[in-house]
């Protein structure tokens, strides 16, 4: 069994946004040389997420609206976490809702997706460098 890892660095210019990182993950699979295995894609920050869904802008707008309803950024006083001097209590909740990582099967050297599935990085406290880990294991 082989393993391979790669780190993706992102700096999203908005507080909240979703970026399709499927091409970067596909490139990591090619670089790994692994034909059959698993690919873990993991947000390495507690205010960011990795998830799988359709790359459809209306859906992304719906997610942003829904997340803001569930965990609004303001008022900042809503979150005890913000009493520490932070202003990102909402971002921690949004990450918890959207999840930390995904695992995708690798079959014949390709990510094995269902119809329309793509891998997204979700940012909830942007405007700084953040890291995504891609860890691939297999044969």
Please annotate each region the language model reported:
Residues 1-139:
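Active-site histidine-anchored catalytic micro-motif
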